[in-house]
Amino acid sequence: MNDDYSKTKSRRLTPWTGRCDSTPLESYIDLCTGRDYDNRHPAILASGEAAFLNSYELSSCRFCGSGTIVKDGFSETGIRRYRCRECGRRFTVITNTIFDSRKLPVSEWVCFLLDLFGYSSFSLTSKVNRNAVSTTKYWVRKLFLLLVGVQDGILLGGKVWVDETFIKVRKGDVEKRPDGKEYRGLSRNQMCIGIACDRENAVFVFEGYGKTSKKKTLDAFSSHIKEGSHLIHDKEEGHSTLVSKLGLTEEAYDSRKLKGIPDNDNPLDRVNELCNLLQQFLSSHSGFNRDDIQDYLNLFSVMVNPPHNKYEKVKKILELGLEKPVLVRFRD
């Protein structure tokens, strides 16, 4: 086996890359692998991204925010460059964004995002897109920063459902009783995720550890539910505060009595479905750092909220990526 192959994690190389004694079949496999890799990772100049990026006209400096900017030629990759008359710095449309200092074209984000929207683990996404695991982790970190606050403007109305789902802390973080046994039920070892939704949109909020409460529920959803809406819930005591504080009408059901009822007849089916999808999503990232739970919930909200077409979701995120100043260096 080629020593270079055994020492690298490059998804471009095969055991026969660079060998002169390969059989015709081995050489053919290596050729196909290289061709596929090159198709997935075009050079920035060949990707056609310059025309797309140059369609965005900047009106202010990417550094100081001044509006006194002038066009100043093009970068070596064909992207329009600007110069600020106020601070004197030069920049492009991708300066101080998630695409700044990139080595791969923006087009690679399309496949990356489509895979994430399909409930793929980050490891699988890395393999499918033939990227190094470190690249995928770096991009995920950028995406999480980009999506901070993405749920802030969601306002639910009409019929609104609310419920909670739970995930366990990681094995190494499990707290035990003095006798060595784990705490039972909705203990401090369970992370509480609040879910509120109407017919079209949904909000996902990490509420803390253990059982929800009136304060947790109010803090999570008071800014996301229109006053006068109709709340449908499972008689959880913490939900009552939303009814009283926001002037809501309500329907309350005993969830134990709804078990076994067909989904179409279950009045809590809308929120139950989201609970199940969220559990499926989190299971695909089973070893994730629980400190990042709200970041994962922000990503999931993009996955299940409008627009429902995946390509329109990609467009939305790429536009946000060019508009929102988020800068992360690989070694940060």
Predicted segment positions?
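Residue-level recognition of single "structural anchor" positions
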Residues: 1-332
